[in-house]
Amino acid sequence: MKTLLSTYLHELHIPFTRSYADKLFAEHPHRYNLYGLSDMLSVYKIENAGIQVEDKDLRELASPFVAHVSNDFVVVRQMSDQAVDYVWREKEISVPVDEFKKLWSGIALVAEPGESSREPEYEKHRETALVNSVQKIGIIMILVVLLVLGSWEHHLFSSVTGGFLLFINLAGVGVSFL
């Protein structure tokens, strides 16, 4: 599941890996408030500030930004004169500006990435993520080859029930692998 931090980093076009960002978010003691999110953005060397917008004037803000909406936080992706597009818990939502202003508390976190804004040890984390992906694909390929060879050698698909039972067992192995 994408976290608020990884969603915001994606919208800011910051080089990051989901595994590091999600782990940082999960382990941060203040992950559900603006202080915590600000602290996490500082790890990525992103200048940021929490602000209170008087009269909820959205024109004062440049997207993307994090907004406090209905006791939760959302990442506002873009705004127009008619609508506000934001991401809330991995759901992309578009609402009229007036409706958004009713939901919004006027509190926002704005960020200004610089040239040095990136994940600490990004290359190392990216390489680790790539190795993990290759390992998963390799295991799946080996299982498929073994399945094909085994079914050919032992005629596993000669009956419908044999094939069905094999499919159920493989589905169980797949679920436990995830």
Regions found by a protein language model. Give the residues of each.
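Contiguous, structured surface segment used for ligand recognition
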Residues: M1-K2, H30-E60
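Membrane-interfacial helix-loop segments of redox and metal-homeostasis proteins
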Residues: I139-L178
